[in-house]
Each structure stands twice: as structure tokens, then as C-alpha cells.
């Protein structure tokens, strides 16, 4: 990535600081930039597309995304700030959040991952409750930002679908393989359960330590994400919740983000202590991450017990 600083023409208000990433197929480059008027850091997305006659190819589709972002007002979605044409295409400016994508090398414990999941679901609830509703269509680790305080932000609405089916932006791909729900891959009708699949796949990557580019290694021959054996220390209820999030058939997932969130809230992520009963003793074993503790309570008579703990 380039670290050189230069000013974009014809709008000198924004000065690029460094390149953050690019999508060659889509002709998009993302920069961290500076607003020379407000002195604030911003995110500047630069789109390049061919000029056909007097019409910009894809301009109306890009304009549609701007309309979507302008209407969104949620603390978990960076605000749209500005947009303008350039000689080679088009630029869009958004609020900058000092947060890293989940694809960046970091580690979270299961409780933190549950909190991240709940935060993303709250954003999806907001999008799904809008009229018309918004389906993001590209939920993956790269598009979920998390800061040091575990504040969560959902970015990149370039593939968003609004209402009955109009896509916010023309694109070569309709998502990211491994995180796309099967109905996206096969161009079937999308609904509120579609984004749940991408979130579930993202959480599985975090919990299993799988890089997003290697998620294909988790699929079995039937096209299902096979992750259960990799999470022996997580509660069965949480594993079942994850499994429901990534069911291949949309009808077998939670119907929407609201239902998924309500099902997640009461779940204890780590596996609860195992209790074994016998005629003379009760044995307690914890299986939480990083801890192994065995407690043995001897029963010597109905009115007298002896206890010992081994850690």
C-alpha cells in the first residue's frame, strides 16, 4: 500500500493519507484521508468506471448507494459525509472509525465474541426494520470493524439490496464465497435470514481461529460448515445457535436478526460445569477456557459430608 500523500483533483478539500485497500475488479480504492476544512480523518472511496457516450457507466447505481447511506442513522454504521465526481470516476466520503476489521490478527475470548455478535445483530435489526428494509449481502470479517472498547461498526454497503430487490451498486460478484448464503450463490430470493449466514460464518472463523481466506477448509462434502468438533469447550446451546445461523436453507435459520438476537441473549457461551452423580459422591468439573477444577463431595452419612477440591 502506498503511504504517499497527495491531493485529489478537482476537490482539494480531501487529502489522502494512505491507501487502506482496493478492489481491482470493482475499480474501487479506499483511502484514509483528511478533511482540510474540519481537520478530521475520513474514509474516502474512489471509484473508477468507463465513460460511455455522455453517461457514466454505473453512476445511477452508485448514486443509489449514496441514497441508502444518507438515510441510515445508527451508531454502528459510519455516516455518509460527501460525494463528488472526478475526471476518472467518482468519490464518496464517510466517517472514519478508529477500529480494525475482524480479519486483522487479533484474539477475542468467547464472551467477547458473543458481545460482538449481539452488536452486529442490533445493527441488522435496525436495517431490517427500515422501510424499505436493507439487506447488506456482504457480511464477513473484513466488513465488521471493532475498536478497543468492543464497539462494532458495519461497513461497505456496496452490495446492499434495498426493499424488494434493487441492488445499491452494480458489481461483478454478489458477495464473498464462504460467507454468501446459498440463496445468494444461486440467485434465489433473499430475505432477512440471508445476512445471518454471513454473520454466523464470521463468528465461526473467529471462534476456530480460521482466516477468512481459508473458510473453505471448514466446509464438508455437502456444503455445510463443519465446525462443531473444533469447539469442544463451548456450550452446546451456543454451538446449536451457531449451527442454526449457517443452515444452508434459509427457512431453517432464524427468520430475522431480531429472533437471532433474542435467542442469543440468554445463552452462556462457555460450557457449564459438568456434574456427575454417584451413590457416595458428587463430582464437579469445570470445562471453561483456561480453567480446570474438580470438586469432590464425599457423602459419609445422611447428615454428614466431607468435601475436598483438587485444582
What are these regions (language model features)?
Residues 87-101:
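Conserved short submotifs of the Hanks-type protein kinase catalytic core
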Residues 51-71:
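AlphaC helix of the eukaryotic protein kinase fold
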Residues 116-117:
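Activation segment signature within eukaryotic-like protein kinase domains
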Residues 128-146:
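Catalytic-loop of the protein kinase fold
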Residues 83:
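Activation-segment/catalytic-loop signature of the eukaryotic protein kinase fold
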Residues 195:
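Conserved catalytic-loop aspartate of Hanks-type protein kinases
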Residues 169-183:
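Conserved activation segment of eukaryotic-like protein kinases, specifically the C-terminal portion
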Amino acid at each position: 500500500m502506498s503511504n504517499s500523500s497527495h491531493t485529489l483533483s478537482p476537490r482539494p478539500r480531501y487529502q489522502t493519507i494512505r491507501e487502506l485497500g482496493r478492489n481491482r475488479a470493482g475499480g474501487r480504492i479506499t483511502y484514509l484521508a483528511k478533511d482540510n476544512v474540519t481537520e478530521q480523518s475520513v474514509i474516502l472511496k474512489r471509484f473508477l468506471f468507463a465513460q460511455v457516450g455522455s453517461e457514466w457507466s454505473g453512476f445511477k447505481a452508485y448514486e443509489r448507494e449514496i441514497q441508502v447511506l444518507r438515510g441510515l442513522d445508527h451508531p454502528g454504521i459510519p455516516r455518509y459525509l460527501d460525494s463528488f465526481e472526478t475526471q476518472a470516476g467518482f468519490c464518496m466520503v464517510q466517517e472514519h472509525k478508529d477500529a480494525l476489521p475482524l480479519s486483522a490478527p487479533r484474539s477475542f475470548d468467547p464472551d467477547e465474541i458473543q458481545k460482538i455478535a449481539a452488536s452486529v445483530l442490533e445493527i441488522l435489526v435496525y436495517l431490517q426494520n427500515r422501510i424499505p428494509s436493507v439487506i447488506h449481502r456482504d457480511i464477513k470479517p473484513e466488513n465488521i470493524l471493532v475498536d478497543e472498547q468492543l464497539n462494532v461498526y458495519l461497513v461497505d454497503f456496496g452490495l446492499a439490496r434495498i426493499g424488494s430487490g434493487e441492488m445499491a451498486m452494480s458489481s461483478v460478484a454478489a458477495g464473498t464465497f464462504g460467507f454468501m448464503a446459498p440463496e445468494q450463490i444461486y440467485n434465489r430470493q433473499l430475505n432477512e435470514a440471508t445476512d445471518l449466514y454471513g454473520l454466523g460464518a464470521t463468528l465461526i472463523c473467529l471462534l476456530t481461529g480460521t482466516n477468512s481466506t481459508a473458510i473453505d477448509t471448514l466446509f464438508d462434502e455437502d456444503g455445510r460448515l463443519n465446525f462443531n468438533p473444533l469447539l469442544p469447550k463451548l456450550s452446546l446451546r451456543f454451538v446449536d445457535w451457531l449451527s442454526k445461523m449457517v443452515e444452508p436453507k434459509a427457512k431453517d435459520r432464524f427468520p430475522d436478526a431480531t429472533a437471532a438476537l433474542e435467542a442469543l441473549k440468554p445463552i452462556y457461551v462457555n460450557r457449564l460445569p459438568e456434574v456427575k452423580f454417584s451413590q457416595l459422591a458428587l463430582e464437579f468439573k469445570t470445562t471453561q477456557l483456561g480453567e480446570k477444577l474438580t470438586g469432590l463431595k464425599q457423602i459419609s452419612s445422611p447428615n454428614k459430608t466431607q468435601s475436598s477440591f483438587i485444582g
